């Protein structure tokens, strides 16, 4: 007679056994409970946006492949440059493979990147770019490598050929071969490899999402973290646009529960609004209260409107540090905010947001 496994303890025992076997076969993090709040002990690098760090379970994981994709001007390069700045601030070495030949050193410096010590390469072909990435990773000296972007990794055969020549699947094969070669070394050296990618439209798709990323399917499989970044609001003062509100969805995460969403501001010419992130988290955790347009702390009004409150925090850095410390304490105690809860499956249209004068 077959054993009765309908009872809850028996099922739990069987579940624990199969999860252990799967993790033993395919590695730690290959399966986990979606509601598990504890993150794996993987070293991470902050992204510059506190809500995104929460959504990722700590930050960008070391020794992993990360893909950041989204429409044009959504903040992909800005996010990558903030990660480079965070690595450099801890004494790490960063490299930027500029396949698009579009890096703005002045903007990178504003974001905190040490451009004097940033390694930069502007390769002519995709093969050269990926070979440079492989050698940098194998050197064990580099902590983060950013490739901007996958779409610009043009195979040598395509460059040497004529306009109009068909090169079906050439870039996809190149990416697949390169990732097979690079991935093992990345895990051993602890280097973060960040691929920035563009979106394309699939032709003839009637049902489902017509968007896809360039470079074939290999990167989707090899990436431990995939971030989908979208512009959802245009920030304005009167009629003047001064930034974007962006939403980042963690489309894939092998080191923490996926499908979380983070929202934050990117200010033109300044990058991610760190104080804006702190204020949003302070409001969600109850450190700062908002009634109508007024923000208050310990019963005392700070300023009217979000923009004015951020300005107040800029003028009072000690107060801002105190608020950040209180927010982090609340989060460490398990406070649930929008960034560490599972995302709703919805499509948001881009909106305009007008700040108070």
UniProtKB/Swiss-Prot annotation:
Family, as annotated: Belongs to the RecA family.
Statement: the UniProt record of this protein carries the keyword tRNA-binding: no
Localization annotation: Cytoplasm
Gene Ontology MF term list: ATP binding; ATP hydrolysis activity; ATP-dependent DNA damage sensor activity; damaged DNA binding; single-stranded DNA binding
One Gene Ontology cellular component annotation held by this UniProt entry: cytosol
Name the record gives this protein: Protein RecA
Keyword Glycoprotein: no
InterPro entries, A to Z: AAA+_ATPase (IPR003593), DNA_recomb/repair_RecA (IPR013765), DNA_recomb/repair_RecA_CS (IPR020584), P-loop_NTPase (IPR027417), RecA-like_C (IPR049261), RecA-like_N (IPR049428), RecA_ATP-bd (IPR020588), RecA_C_sf (IPR023400)
């Amino acid at each position: 007679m077959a054993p009765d496994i309908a009872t809850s303890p028996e099922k739990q025992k069987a579940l624990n056994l199969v999860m252990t076997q799967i993790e033993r076969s395919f590695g730690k993090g290959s399966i986990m409970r979606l509601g598990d709040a504890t993150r794996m002990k993987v070293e991470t690098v902050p992204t510059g946006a506190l809500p995104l760090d929460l959504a990722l379970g700590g930050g960008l994981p070391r020794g992993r492949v990360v893909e950041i994709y989204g429409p044009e001007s959504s903040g992909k390069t800005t996010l990558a440059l903030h990660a480079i700045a965070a690595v450099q601030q801890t004494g790490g070495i960063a490299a930027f493979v500029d396949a698009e030949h579009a890096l703005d050193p002045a903007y990178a410096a504003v974001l905190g990147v040490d451009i004097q010590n940033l390694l930069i390469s502007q390769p002519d072909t995709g093969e050269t770019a990926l070979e440079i990435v492989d050698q940098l990773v194998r050197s064990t000296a580099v902590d983060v490598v950013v490739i901007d972007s996958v779409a610009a990794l043009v195979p040598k055969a395509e460059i040497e050929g004529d306009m109009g020549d068909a090169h079906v699947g050439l870039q996809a094969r190149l990416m697949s071969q390169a990732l097979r070669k690079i991935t093992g070394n990345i895990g051993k050296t602890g280097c973060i490899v960040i691929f920035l990618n563009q979106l394309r439209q699939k032709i003839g798709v009637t049902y489902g999402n017509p968007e896809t990323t360039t470079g074939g399917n290999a990167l989707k499989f090899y990436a431990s973290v995939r971030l989908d970044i979208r512009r959802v609001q245009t920030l304005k003062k009167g009629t003047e646009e001064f930034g974007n509100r962006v939403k980042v969805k963690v489309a894939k995460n092998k080191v923490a529960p996926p499908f979380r969403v983070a929202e934050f501001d990117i200010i033109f010419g300044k990058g991610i609004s760190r104080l804006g992130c702190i204020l949003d988290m302070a409001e969600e955790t109850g450190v700062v209260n908002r009634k109508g347009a007024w923000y208050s702390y310990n019963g005392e009004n700070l300023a009217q409107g979000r923009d004015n409150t951020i300005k107040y925090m800029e003028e009072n850095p000690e107060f801002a540090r105190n608020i950040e410390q209180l927010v982090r304490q609340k989060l460490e105690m398990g406070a649930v905010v929008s960034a560490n809860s599972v995302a709703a499956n919805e499509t948001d249209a881009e909106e305009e947001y007008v700040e108070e004068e």
